[in-house]
Every structure is written in structure tokens, then in C-alpha cells.
Amino acid sequence: MKPQMFFRSVIQFYSKPSWMQRSYSSGNAEFNISGEVISILAKKKPIEPALEPLVPFLSKNIITSVIKDEVNRQLGFRFFIWASRRERLRSRESFGLVIDMLSEDNGCDLYWQTLEELKSGGVSVDSYCFCVLISAYAKMGMAEKAVESFGRMKEFDCRPDVFTYNVILRVMMREEVFFMLAFAVYNEMLKCNCSPNLYTFGILMDGLYKKGRTSDAQKMFDDMTGRGISPNRVTYTILISGLCQRGSADDARKLFYEMQTSGNYPDSVAHNALLDGFCKLGRMVEAFELLRLFEKDGFVLGLRGYSSLIDGLFRARRYTQAFELYANMLKKNIKPDIILYTILIQGLSKAGKIEDALKLLSSMPSKGISPDTYCYNAVIKALCGRGLLEEGRSLQLEMSETESFPDACTHTILICSMCRNGLVREAEEIFTEIEKSGCSPSVATFNALIDGLCKSGELKEARLLLHKMEVGRPASLFLRLSHSGNRSFDTMVESGSILKAYRDLAHFADTGSSPDIVSYNVLINGFCRAGDIDGALKLLNVLQLKGLSPDSVTYNTLINGLHRVGREEEAFKLFYAKDDFRHSPAVYRSLMTWSCRKRKVLVAFNLWMKYLKKISCLDDETANEIEQCFKEGETERALRRLIELDTRKDELTLGPYTIWLIGLCQSGRFHEALMVFSVLREKKILVTPPSCVKLIHGLCKREQLDAAIEVFLYTLDNNFKLMPRVCNYLLSSLLESTEKMEIVSQLTNRMERAGYNVDSMLRFEILKYHRHRKQVLIDL
């Protein structure tokens, strides 16, 4: 319809505006229409009917222009709400502009007043107008207000659309404690027949990956593809980044190539994410190979990429290359940011160049970058690691005078170091300082001090500190949250009580540092070390009443504690009573080790067979065949069969083999132990230094010196440095044998090249040998 024809049809209802009397030209049309809209806003009440005839002539630019020029913010909000009902008039510019207006003084209050006026006047509102309000609250860090706005949509007879759900989900996924609530909202979205889109799944998967919940993220991806939604470039990048975060760089690389073949060409974010994944694992050869391939495709290495590579080189202890790469980066006029400075300071600290790290830290302000808490913490940790506790403490005090105020991590580093050096009282003083400064101690801070108190034998004080953590959080709320699961939040969201659910979670998050399973494990370990196994078992019951679940460390600690006090039967009862933890290899290894110490090698062997069957690595027939071989004394055949299965499944674990080897030594079955050693060496499976020590000592005692020398040479070939005691025993045994005197000379040359202090060892053994010979002659 031509403009002139349209206005003839509506002219009877409205007086002719001045701009319509002029000729219609594209050059000044938008300006004229904007002026007419502002005139209507100033003169007409209500504005909505007067604006309707202008709809065909309005554009996104005009909407933004009017909102920007309107002096009365409330009228600007009302105009935005009216215009946003039409999707073609929505734009990022107007959306962002209104967010800025809401962020100003009383902006949100004026917006709510506008919404209330519209409701009173019977004017309907669209969910889009709530999206902008929720986004504004989120931008200002007022998440509770954002949730409240979402919850109040029903008051305005306004149903959220997928865009609104995406906005509120993004707010909730930022905090781990609100995960349950986010998924309750997602479930409500599905119940309301509001179909999630690609961005919904992207928000949920990104949040899940960032919190380490990779299996849930994978389920979400499967749900997305099951709905016929294909991933786009952003989704692929989220998946690649998530896989890299959990250490699955190879899977991420496959997905990267799949992304390329699907037509979603990776951008710099995806390239950097994959590069960072390999760097985090220290696989620098592959990282640089990837970089070469990327550069062939036109990728240009920037600050993010350089930071990942430098960090990876530091992790791989390739310090020289890391600094060379940093120098190359500077030559390309790429300036480091706070993240790279932190990486460099950490790298220098790990390389033992603490003075250089301090210089870099002090030079940052002159480069226009203020050191943050992470930078200071890296240096403080390095100083404390070298035992320079006073210097670390001084830097913490210096830090207090800057904008980078010490955080819970700073105090935890100092407390750990103090406790490690036996300075528990000083650690307690630092802990007191935290509370006085208004900085809340984290769970890790509490755990560090509890551990220090336990190791110094102050179990009563450690228990009181745990109680102090518990007092900070209402148990009833904790139990309600830990036992109810998502169901209670689903109900609250469905009934419109989303704000109450949010406040419950926020209260839970803000009421102090609740003891976690690590807190209890530290204390249980303290009681076990002190021989108070009954006190440790009571703590097991307490933590379960608090809604916590014991983990493999809990059971491993208790099983070890029970064995130490000779309560073997109870240890096995505890083991068999908890099916969940029969899957943990650590618990199995612990029981196997204790069984071997009591010379029950067959029991240890059968335990591992049960573990393999439990995790479906072994079928019953094969397991029975291997067990029968071991029972009948065919140890080598059983061992080779197991190694063959482990290698085939790519699940080779060193633990059971070394436990059996040491167990055979402890049982005096050195012939079989030597056979295990030979098979492991043949299969290129590393035999641990403790296993070698047991073998050498036992073989020397049985005068099997050739075999003992063979094992010792193996340790030299693998750069193991054994303690002087076993080396002295070997040399002493060789010197007592007249046939082995020549070998002593050859062996000491090898030892000297390996860094052993041969002179002192040899002098000691030769002196001992001569004294022995002298005594023999006297006796004769």
C-alpha cells in the first residue's frame, strides 16, 4: 500500500500531522517520523492508539533514535514496550540502549512504574520487555532482582518465550549453587511447550562444562540432537572448549575436524580452545604441530594463543622455550595482559627464579597493569615453597596496602606453609586475621588448618574448628537441599515461587563455609593416625547425618586405620558393606597391600579379580581361568594373561603388579617375585623403586647376588636414586663374596656416574669388610 493511500484511510481519526503535509522524501523521512513520534509522546495520553497509524513507517533506527532523544525516561520506556511487541522493530541497539537507561539512577523503578501503569490501563505487554529488565539486573549484578522479574511475569499475564527463558537461564548458570534451580526452570519451559532452541542448549552446556559436569553436558547435547537441532559454530566451540577443560583433547580435536567438514568453519575462539587443551596437558609437540596446521589455514596467533603456549611450556618445564616465545611475542608488538603476567610470574616461580618473579611483579604498574591477587599469590606460594615464610608474610602485608587485597587463597597458602613447618600457632593467628579483616575463610582454608592441627596431635581443636564451620550454616536448610534434589525446585518453580527457591539457595551459599567431605576426611585421618579408630568411625556417621556422602578417600582412610590397630575383620566388613566404593581401585589396592603384609598374597590377587569383574573388564570364565592358574602356582601364566588383557583394553594399571611383587617378597617367595620383575621388565612396565628395594634386600639376604645386581642395574637404567641403606647392603654383600670383588669396582663406577656418593659408601663398606675379616682371623 502506498503511503498516501494508507493515510487517507486513517485521516478521519487523526488530525493531519505537519510532517505529512510536506512532500515525502527518503532523505528526511526518518527524521520527520521521529519528530512526530516524540510529539505524540509529549501530547497524547495514552500514547499507544496515537502511535498505531505510524507502524508501517517505523524502523529499527527510528525506534532507537526516539528512545535516545526522549528526555522523559518513563515515556521512552513506554514507547520501547509498545514497539517491542513487533518483532521487526526490535534491535540490539534499542535493547542495549534501554539496558543502559535502566542502569541509571531509579531506572528500574521507573520501568516498573511504567509496567504497572500499562497493567492498570489494560494494555498488554510482551515477554521481550521483561527480557530487557532481566538483562539489566544481571548486568548490574542483581541476580535476585532478575529472578524476581522473571517470577512476576505472571502478574502481567505475560508468558515467557524461548528468548526470555534463555536470558534467565544464563543468569542462573553463572553460579554453581543455582544449577538445580536453572534445570527446574528448564523443566518448566518444557512443560509449557516452549521448545528450547540452539542458544538454550548452548547456555546449559557451557555452564555445565565450566563447572566440570561433563556427563550432564553430553546428555544435554544428545537431547539437542535428538530434537533435530544441529550444532552451529558457537555450539561446536562450547563442546570443544568443554572437552579440553576435562582433559579430553583428542576427542576435542576429532570434533574440531567434524566442525570443519560440517561447514561450520572454526573461528579464533575454537582454534585457541583446542590449542589450550593440548597445552594444559603438557603435550607441546602436538600443540605446535596444531599451530602449524592452523597457520596454513590463515589462523594468526594472538595474545590468547601465546598465553596458552607459554603456560604449556611452563607446565612441561621447558622454561627457556617459554621465555623465547614470550620475547617473540613482544617483537610482534603484542602486549601482555594480566592473565599472561600471572602465567609468567607462576612460571618464573616454578623455575626457582623468585627474584625475577618479584621484579616482574613490581614492574607491572609502570606498564599500566596493576597486579591482581593471582599474581601476588603465585609469588607468595613460591616463597613459602622454599621455606621463606617471613618473606611470604611480608608480601601478603604489602598486598594489603594495594587494591589487590589478600583473598582466602592467599591465607590458605600461608596457613598450609605454616602448618607444614610445624608453626600451627602462627597459622591460627593468620586464620584469626582473616575473620577480623572481613574476608570469609574458604572451605580450603578451614581444611588446611584442620589438617595442621591433626598432624600436630591437637584433635580436640581440630574438631572444634569443624564444629565452627557447621555452625555457620543452618543444618535444616542444608539437609533440605541435599536430600530433596531437583524435585522440590521443580515444584517451587511450577507454583510460581521461583524467588523463594532462589533466596533459599542464596542463603545457603552466603551462610559461611560448610564442611565438605575433604574436611571430614582430614579429621578422620587425624583420628586414625592417633589410633582413635572409634572416634574416626563416629565421624563417618556424623558426616552422613549432615547429608554428605563418604568417598573412596573416606573408606580408604578408615580401612587403613582399622588395619593399623589390628581390626582386620572390621576393615573387610566396612569394605563389603558399601557396594558403591567397591568400584574404587584405591580401596582395593589398600586392602591388597594389607593382605600382602600379612602374607595373604592369594587374598590380594582375588581382590583384584573381583574388582576387574565388578567394572566389567573381565568375564567370569576368564577370571576363573586366571585365578586357577594362580592357585596352582602358575604365577607367570596368570600374570602374563592379566597383562595381555590390560594392554588390549588400554587400561594398564601399575598398582596391582607392584603390590603383588612386594607381597611375594614379604612372603619370602623371591623366586616368584623375581619372575614378576622379569615379566614386567620384558613388557616395558615400570617397576617402582620400593619394589626394587624389596627385591635387592631379599636377594642379597639369600645370597642371590647376580639377581640383586641385575635389579640394581635396572634402577640405574631408569634413573632411580635409592637410599644409601640398600646400596650399602648390596655393596656389603658383594664385598663378603670373594667372587664378586671385581664387580664392585665396575658397579661403583656406574653408581658414581648416576650421582651416588660412592666414596663414602665404599669407605664404609670396605672398613666394615676389613673389620669382619680381622674378627674372622682372630677367631681362627
Swiss-Prot record:
Gene3D superfamilies: Tetratricopeptide repeat domain. Keywords: Repeat. GO terms for molecular function: mRNA binding. It comes from the Eukaryota. PPR repeats lie at residues 91-125, 126-160, 161-196, 197-231, 232-266, 267-301, 302-336, 337-371, 372-406, 407-441, 442-476, 481-515, 516-550, 551-585, 653-687, 688-722, 723-758. PANTHER family: MITOCHONDRIAL GROUP I INTRON SPLICING FACTOR CCM1, PENTACOTRIPEPTIDE-REPEAT REGION OF PRORP DOMAIN-CONTAINING PROTEIN. Belongs to the PPR family. P subfamily. NCBIfam families: PPR. This is Pentatricopeptide repeat-containing protein At1g79540. The lineage of its organism: Eukaryota, Viridiplantae, Streptophyta, Embryophyta, Tracheophyta.
